[in-house]
From Swiss-Prot:
GO terms for biological process: rRNA 5'-end processing. Its EC number is 3.1.-.-. It comes from Syntrophomonas wolfei subsp. wolfei (strain DSM 2245B / Goettingen). GO terms for cellular component: cytosol. It comes from the Bacteria. Could be a nuclease involved in processing of the 5'-end of pre-16S rRNA. This is Putative pre-16S rRNA nuclease. It is found in: Cytoplasm.
């Protein structure tokens, strides 16, 4: 089963895909956000191209596990995504995924500009790989 992983941001969406067996996550691209309709249209094209059967969306919970404004916005995006694409959407706790991605990029000794370009894609990989390794949060959020 091919799964798409997304790291949703205000300006960009990091995109990753699993291999066809659903074992490993690979970074794909970064979508510069251009409005909900255009974002959904692009993601739909990718889902068709890669024959995606499920989408995993990083859920930005607060450090104490509660949901703040960003998590609520993510849920709204997930509802729109599932309605438009007719593909199940699951959540994964993304706390510290961007920090983890930044650490990887720092260790790779990339420039600040290059790190900024890649961080969302790497965060999407971290979210998706964690999901593949550990199961899902389900629909409780």
């Amino acid at each position: 089963m091919r799964i798409m992983g997304l790291d949703l941001g205000e300006k960009r969406i990091g995109i990753a895909f699993s291999d066809p067996m659903g074992w490993t996550a690979q970074g794909h691209s970064i979508l510069q956000r251009k409005g909900l309709k255009k974002d959904l249209s692009y993601l739909q094209e990718l889902c068709q191209e890669f024959q995606v059967e499920k989408i995993v969306l990083g859920l930005p919970l607060n450090m104490n596990g509660t949901m703040g404004p960003k998590a609520l916005e993510t849920q709204e995006f997930a509802r729109a995504l599932q309605e438009a694409l007719k593909i199940p959407v699951d959540f994964w706790d993304e706390r510290l995924s961007s920090k983890s991605a930044e650490r990887v990029l720092l260790e790779a000794d990339l420039s600040r500009k290059r790190r900024k370009e890649l961080i969302d894609k790497i965060a999407a990989v971290h979210i998706l790989q964690a999901y593949l390794d550990g199961g899902s949060l389900g629909k409780d959020y």
